[in-house]
Regions:
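Periplasmic c-type cytochrome electron-transfer domains
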Residues: 1-307
Length: 307
């Protein structure tokens, strides 16, 4: 409904329904606002500021106000027969740094073929949408894998599930070309995207209150982590290693993702088969040399959630 061949609608965001049943939608990846009807494929578009997201209708439905996150401004949309936009700045704009320019590119669907997707489409706000994606990241189709988080990724080289990319620049170039099907980024675009991704910090543990209440369990779990030789693949302080390993999943040799922030992942393993850390340890007994006692499982879980 929103996108057409040759004119996509990457990353639709805020939407509002008018009294006559028509709708107004912010197309955050293409920097546009569209108006249309649910029974039609026609979408009238008007260009607005960078990354329009929030959208509100005036009480009479004649205008819409949209916030443009990356332009520090708002746009007022006249919803007449031919929609038009008036931009309102919220103040002086500082000179953009490479990080700032990279952030704009990260959320910009024009990097992809016809504007169907942005980096943010899969790596939500630099993190992960938690879904499986069958891309050419490993050189072929037919082996869908969980979208990896980019938070703290600068410290966890190499890149891609199979560790084939030794530099972040190579990984970004490859993703734009094969996953997004876009034109190769210019040297400046590539440098800016890398600057933004390098600036994404690792998330804090999701359960800090639990950690504070269980310091003894966390310490016991840390010792157990070493005794079970989990460090062989997930070596501190980054809790990963630069090598690839046979993890017993088909013919895939995987570079282990960092365990930092692992408590914030709703699904685990390359194919999302584990729905929790409890399943990784209890149901799948992932790479464990022996069966754990109930207390050992609790201790190991407490430690992993502290990372």
């Amino acid at each position: 409904m929103l996108g057409q061949p040759g004119q996509a609608a990457g990353d639709p965001a805020g939407v509002a329904i008018r009294r006559d049943g028509s709708f107004v939608v912010a197309l955050s990846g293409t920097n546009q606002v569209g108006t249309g009807r649910p029974d039609s494929f026609e979408l009238a578009r008007v260009s607005v500021g960078r990354r329009p997201t929030g959208l509100w209708l005036a009480p009479n439905g004649a205008r819409a106000i949209v916030t443009c996150e990356l332009d520090d401004g708002i746009d007022v949309i006249d919803l007449g027969a031919t929609p038009s936009a008036t931009s309102i700045s919220l103040g002086p704009r500082p000179e953009l740094t490479p990080f700032d320019r990279g952030e704009r590119l990260f959320f910009d669907a024009s990097l992809s073929r016809n504007g169907w997707m942005s980096c943010h489409s899969c790596h939500t706000d630099g993190h992960s949408n938690g879904r499986l994606a069958d891309t050419l990241g490993d050189g072929h189709y037919g082996n869908a894998k969980r979208v990896l988080s980019l938070l703290g990724t600068i410290d966890t080289r190499p890149w891609a599930w199979d560790g084939r990319m030794s530099t972040l620049r190579a990984q970004v170039t490859h993703s734009v070309a094969t996953t997004m099907r876009g034109a190769p980024p210019t040297p400046r675009q590539l440098g800016d995207l890398v600057a933004f991704i390098e600036g994404l910090e690792q998330p804090a543990p999701a359960r800090l209150s639990t950690i504070a209440r269980q310091p003894v369990e966390v310490l016991r779990g840390q010792r157990l982590f070493g005794q079970l030789d989990c460090r062989r693949c997930h070596a501190p302080p980054l809790y990963t290693t630069p090598d690839t390993y046979d993890v017993g999943i088909g013919d895939l040799k995987a570079n282990p993702p960092s365990l930092r922030g692992v408590s914030q992942r709703p699904r685990l393993f390359h194919d999302n088969r584990a729905r929790s850390l409890e399943e990784v340890i209890g149901k799948f007994e992932h790479q464990l040399p022996r069966e754990l006692t109930e207390r050992e499982r609790r201790d190991l879980l407490s430690f992993l959630r502290s990372l």
